């Protein structure tokens, strides 16, 4: 069960599917820690990163091959799966494999996309855009509810602070909790430094523990964390990824 008063849930995995072997390895690392630290676990991976800085950037295996890999992972480990969609037509096939459909932050105002995702009846994870206030996300919630879907999660991922930087307003957690929806904290992407690596996004992954502690202290439902066996070699958002050594996260609120 996912909720602000329930046991912490981690949406954990990789930024994008690089290979079947890699995501299976990452899933096993999270499963091991979820058992030891007693948090609920949902595996996250993208089949396509449509929003990349450069045309040369790696995007992923695509819808068909990506869903096949996610389906195999789900069957092997009996895990709930989260992935994101970028176009309305992707909602139906994704809903046949995944338990949670994520709306990317940059696409959260795309009404057709949001509505098609909501029509599947799946849990919808709404990533609050970097350019949007906490209260504005409530309009997106209404779009989902307009087609009868009240299974909605709100996810904080920082706000634009000048050029090439993001900051997290800690008050956003309490504002979003006013909706009574489960609130998550995307620690990984809140540490982005967009455009700082010329053709890709930089980041400050070394501060993941500090931000994770701050988020947990707000009594939220869970954290969103992406990892990689070697972040320096990750094909997308490596500078923001959590190293395996940092997967041992605090799971009780800090006072």
Feature locations, PLM:
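Glycine-rich, proline-tolerant flexible connector loops at the mouths of alpha/beta enzymes
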Residues: 14-19, 44-61, 229-236
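Catalytic beta/alpha-barrel core
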Residues: 79-87, 100-110, 123-134, 153-157
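Catalytic alpha/beta core domains of metabolic enzymes, predominantly
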Residues: 129-224
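Single conserved hydrophobic/aromatic residue that forms the stacking wall/gate
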Residues: 246-255
């Amino acid at each position: 069960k996912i909720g602000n008063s329930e046991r912490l849930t981690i949406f954990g995995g990789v930024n994008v599917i690089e290979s079947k072997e890699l995501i299976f390895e990452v899933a096993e690392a999270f499963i091991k820690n979820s058992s030891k630290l007693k948090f609920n676990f949902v595996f996250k991976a993208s089949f396509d990163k449509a929003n990349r800085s450069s045309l040369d950037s790696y995007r992923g295996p695509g819808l068909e091959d990506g869903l096949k890999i996610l389906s195999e992972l789900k069957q092997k480990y009996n895990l709930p799966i989260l992935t994101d969609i970028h176009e309305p037509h992707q909602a139906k096939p994704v809903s046949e494999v995944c338990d949670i459909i994520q709306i990317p932050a940059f696409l959260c105002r795309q009404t057709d996309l949001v509505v098609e995702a909501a029509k599947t009846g799946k849990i919808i994870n709404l990533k609050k855009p970097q350019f949007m206030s906490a209260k504005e996300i409530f309009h997106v919630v209404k779009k989902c509810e307009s087609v009868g879907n009240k299974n909605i999660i709100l996810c904080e991922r920082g706000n634009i602070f000048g050029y090439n930087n993001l900051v997290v307003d800690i008050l956003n957690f309490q504002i979003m909790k006013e909706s009574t929806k489960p609130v998550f904290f995307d620690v990984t992407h809140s540490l982005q430094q967009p455009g700082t690596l010329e053709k890709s996004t930089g980041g400050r992954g070394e501060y993941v523990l500090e931000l994770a502690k701050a988020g947990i202290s707000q009594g939220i439902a869970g954290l969103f964390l992406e990892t990689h066996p070697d972040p320096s070699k990750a094909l997308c958002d490596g500078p923001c990824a959590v190293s395996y050594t940092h997967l041992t996260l605090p799971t009780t609120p800090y006072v």
